[in-house]
Amino acid sequence: MTTKSLSELLEELTPKRVVEELNKYVVGQEEAKKAVAIALRNRWRRQKLPENLRNEVIPKNILMIGPTGVGKTEIARRLANLIKAPFVKVEATKYTEIGYVGRDVESMVRELVEVSFQMVKQEKMKEVRERARRLAEERLLDYLVPHQFTSFGIRESRDAGKREELRQKLRKGELDDRIVEIEVKEKTVPMVGIAGPPGLEELENQIKEMLSGLIPSKRRRKVKVKEALQILEQEEAEKLIDMEEVAREAIYRAENFGIIFIDEIDKIAVKTPGAGPGVSREGVQRDLLPILEGTTVNTKYGPVKTDHILFIGAGAFHMAKPSDLIPELQGRFPIRVELKPLTKEDFKRILVEPENALTKQYIELLKTENVYLEFTDDAIEEIARIAEEINTKTENIGARRLHTVMEKLLEDISFNAPEMAGQTIIIDAKFVKAKLENLVKDEELSRYIL
């Protein structure tokens, strides 16, 4: 996808349309959906401004407040998928203040650029796939039918018939399991990540590049023909792509369309500044400030400006309040939205409405074994009631509770499915109660199982 088509896609995605798309996957939380839809539209509006004014318009970062499992991450991830934007999710607690052992906050920007680079690279590889396939086919045939030369160094033509015969077999898949020895490019040496002072990740990348030059660039491998074709196609596609152009496009996308989702931001909020572990947490907040305000981060693909990256902070804020963040950081998240805890009615909708609804997933999974599930309305009601009850009695983990409830409910059917081929199983309220009622009553047991 080119920058132009990305801009065109943004133009089509009006705030209403964005909310409609998000509704396909996330139930409720209208306020949060509206906030991200407006933030997305403002990106397109900014692209339309004169350049001198464009640089003045900075994205309004969003702070999502709400318990776990209510859709914070899903809203941000679906938004990024909608516009094919680079997206990374990081946890605020994984970072340490500059000068301490651990990851420095700039690494989140480097991760974003890496994601952006891989996205652009895959798009470019799709464009050259047909040509790469033809070139890979020729290389593979060279291995299967080595060229014969005359004493004068002229290639003999008699191998042409054999070559064409093998080409047809190759395309039909008749040679897939045959073993062939090919010469492949050696991958970069894997290195174990080391926790250390800031900048070490960048140094690690440079060392990898140096070592890759010292190690033989090619080696011979024996693989099946099917795998050989894939390896050679990948190599040929990479040769056809201008990696410098990919890097430039990746940086542009990361700078102008990138989204960084900072989860558990409430865990670095400090109630009593200047004491105990709060000192380090406050340090992480201060290290985040320049990135949120706009700075330049050096990456292996080139310098990246963070001025127009959209940051979405998220946290439950049970133990702390947004006002416990340092004032400067609070100011960097001008848009605040509160996500509501999920109710039984929400659970009922989550089970059936989204395109990736859990009931639909289980129906399709078991259909592969020729086992047909049917969920009645009273079963959906009962599953939702049980999920809400367990969330109330134990830890409230939101919609994630439905996964554990459904897994336990269908455990026996999933286990015995191969022997149940051709059967249709009706899941009704009676079935749900029989499987789960005792577990729900036993609070201690439900803590461990559900």
Curated annotation (Swiss-Prot):
Its main location: cytoplasm. One of its GO terms (cellular component) is HslUV protease complex. ATP binds at V27, G69, V70, G71, K72, T73, E74, D263, E328, R400. InterPro entries: AAA+_ATPase, ATP-dep_Clp_protease_ClpX, ATPase_AAA_core, Clp_ATPase_C, HslU, P-loop_NTPase. NCBIfam families: hslU, PRK05201.1. One of its GO terms (molecular function) is ATP hydrolysis activity. GO terms for biological process: protein unfolding; proteolysis involved in protein catabolic process. Belongs to the ClpX chaperone family. HslU subfamily. It comes from the Bacteria. It is found in: Cytoplasm. The keyword Cytoplasm applies. ATPase subunit of a proteasome-like degradation complex; this subunit has chaperone activity. The binding of ATP and its subsequent hydrolysis by HslU are essential for unfolding of protein substrates subsequently hydrolyzed by HslV. HslU recognizes the N-terminal part of its protein substrates and unfolds these before they are guided to HslV for hydrolysis. A double ring-shaped homohexamer of HslV is capped on each side by a ring-shaped HslU homohexamer. The assembly of the HslU/HslV complex is dependent on binding of ATP. Keywords: ATP-binding, Chaperone, Cytoplasm, Nucleotide-binding. This is ATP-dependent protease ATPase subunit HslU.
